[in-house]
Amino acid sequence: MINSLLTRVFGSRNERQLRQLTRLVTQINALEPTIEKLSDAELQAKTPEFKQRLAAGESLDKILPEAFAVCREASRRVLGMRHYDVQLIGGMVLHLGKIAEMRTGEGKTLVATLPVYLNALQGEGVHVVTVNDYLARRDAAQMGKLYNWLGLSVGVVYPGMPHSDKREAYGSDITYGTNNEFGFDYLRDNMALSRADRYQRTLHYAIVDEVDSILIDEARTPLIISGPADESPELYIRVNRIVPQLTKQESEEGEGDFWVDEKGKQVHLSEAGMGHAEELLLQAGILENAEDGLYAAQNLSVVHHLNAALRAHAIYQRDVDYIVRDGEVVIVDEFTGRTLSGRRWSDGLHQAVEAKEGVPVQRENQTLASITFQNLFRMYKKLSGMTGTADTEAYEFQSIYGLEVVVIPTNRPTVRKDHPDQVFLNRKGKFNAVLADIEDCAKRGQPVLVGTTSIETSEMLSEHLRKAGVKHEVLNAKQHEREATIVANAGQPGAVTIATNMAGRGTDIVLGGSLESEYHALGEDATEDARFKIKTDWQRRHDAVKAAGGLHIIGTERHESRRIDNQLRGRAGRQGDPGSSRFYLSLEDNLMRIFASDWVQKAMRMMGMKEDDVIEDRLVSRQIEKAQRKVEAHNFDIRKNLLDFDDVNNDQRKVIYAQRDELLDAESVKDNVDGIRGDVIYDLVARFVPPNSVDEQWDVKGLEATLESELGVTLSLTDMVRTQEEIDAEQIAAKVQAAVDAHFAEKEAAVGNDTMRALEKHVMLTVLDQGWKEHLAKMDYLRQGIYLRGYAQKQPKQEYKKEAFELFSEMLENVKREVIHLLARVRIRSEEEVAELEEQERLHAQARLMASQFQHQDVGGYGTDEEAAQVQSGNAPVPVSQVTRDEPKVGRNDPCPCGSGKKYKHCHGQLS
């Protein structure tokens, strides 16, 4: 009550911030007459002037009014677009490192030019992050004209571009790209073996377009660079034949072999199902011993494959969760409806789906490097974002990213009519009403956009409309190549467009059709008469559509998130245009079936509702919104939990990447190697000759044998121990140290200082990377089983932190040992020996090629020749992309970032 009273008196925090920023807008507008009088050359000269002022110590905030005024005037001259006052406010919000919520059609792309120009003046690089490559290239091309005119360089990064071009793009003042590309480039940079192979500079400032999609929707999926593991995918094919023989039960207490937890997207075997599955696996020869049981330790791999196959069959649906294209299973993004080429599900799920669909099963992947978007974007010194729908997730933005959401008022009042939801008993009744609404709009010449949650639904509606003779377009992951054309025509009079969520973002639907597209089709050489005719025809269509009520939005199902529903609604009513929206629901929809209260369904059935009967009731709408809030809270918990675990990995990642940076920057790592060698020898001697021990406890022969086998050093210690009475463990350690040092000095003398320094650096980087890769695999296994600690009354997160620290310390010790072992045993060959070895390898390669081309296949027990061929020909996954940030250097006497409480030099700085 007090908060409500204070808000009425002083206004909400959002209103107070807008009032403060409006004062700056007044200053910018006051500068406009002066800026307008400047010639082009004088206006362009402002950029170097601003840079000089910043170098002299002036702040960005101080030059903001003038820089914004310059950018606005340059935009008017170059692009023919002048920023509105509300767009200036949006630009200031972005500069302040906050999220600007701006409705569809308010010109977010133009808004971003203001803070991008201002922050690019510092020369440290600005990243503009978009949701797909098309938008990145489009915006870089369109807005690049403005930035280039103002004297700033612009680059765009995309998958597969040449290394030199990508380095140049990252060296530009402004770089456009997708969140995936920036993230994968960061990971790639931290796998590079030389500075010259790296792309990025420091992570200075990022503006994230459609920030809710990237930082919320995609936060549950970490970016992973992976390589194929050694395990054969054949077991997925064999287990896949068994799953169709298992029976699904309707609930946990029902009869059958397994039940599905749709909320958690998991499948659970019943008691009977375990026995039945065990029997089938024994018959197929997958389980070897009936006495061991399915859950015996040696069968855990089979359980993993069985669970993956059950999820593939019972939960993941073709044309909903994925499509099959050119013999590959391609994931469909549940939030955007776009295909995610190059992305693969983890934990064997992708292989299980491939086996289910009968396409070549690729090998399971091993993680080489990974990071979540949460930890990636939190590394930027300053982060901001813009979207049309952020306010519903304001708490998450604030709690995880420290980003405040500021709602920017529209330039013109929104006049869109949002009609109440209509709820039907079943899907048939719902779709009858949807089809009737579409046909009515088409007859009246009102364009309609029909939003669906799956490809399957969009194609089903398309089939019904085709039979009814209604001309329409379908936009889903299968037709994504035609997206720009379909969206450009979606505002034509009477146009019917059926779309998955992918139509919800990026491109405005203009009433009457896209005038820009028609101008572009004419070409630059078109006469003024031709352009005038196009404009006249468009204006006539535009007015006709406005008279018919503007764009009408039909939602065929509520999404789990209110934000996605709001995005669909937001396609209509842009810039004060008329428009309308309505959602059609049924009790069979996933959201209603899984999350809505049972009493809603019971009440509707008790009322004797028939198939085509409809309910429009606020109480039902409130229940639907309550269900959505439940799902949003559930998904937030998942993302928060992911972050809690990844923060442990992130601390370790920072340590490893900081050490890699030190190694890459160092002229020589000889001091590092010498220090590590001392530690390794001390530990080695202590294994056989413990400190403060008597000679009866010593294993001198074991020490001699280990020195020979692990370090290639022949040293006789037995005689020394036998002949010297006063000898102790320290003297033995000193003798071993001297012998190993001499061995290394001899090796260096043979190959030369420069070669040895290069070899040391290469070995340290290679071994560190291999150790980190193996450590990531161990961390994955630890994480998968950590929840079982809860049964022992232990906190899984605390146990994860503790065991992850132990694994990390063990990994660093192993890296130190491996570096010294490799350097001690490496042999530098002469040029003649190298030539001979290369010739031998060439002959071996030819023999392997002949063997693979003419390999004879043994008769399989259960598989077909086709399935065997699929296993043999599985394509290795294409590695995906990365981003770099130089963290503040950790001093050797500073506390270690891993949280152990030790000094860095005594903990994870030991390699340094």
From Swiss-Prot:
GO terms for molecular function: ATP binding; metal ion binding; protein-exporting ATPase activity. Pfam families: P-loop_SecA, SEC-C, SecA_DEAD, SecA_PP_bind, SecA_SW. This is Protein translocase subunit SecA. Residues 902-912 have a biased composition (Basic residues). Residues 865-912 are annotated as: Disordered. GO terms for cellular component: cell envelope Sec protein transport complex; cytosol; plasma membrane. It catalyses: ATP + H2O + cellular proteinSide 1 = ADP + phosphate + cellular proteinSide 2. Zn(2+) binds at residues 896, 898, 907-908. Keywords: ATP-binding, Cell inner membrane, Cell membrane, Cytoplasm, Membrane, Metal-binding, Nucleotide-binding, Protein transport, Translocase, Translocation, Transport, Zinc. It is a peripheral membrane protein. Its EC number is 7.4.2.8. The gene is secA. GO terms for biological process: intracellular protein transmembrane transport; protein import; protein targeting; protein transport by the Sec complex.
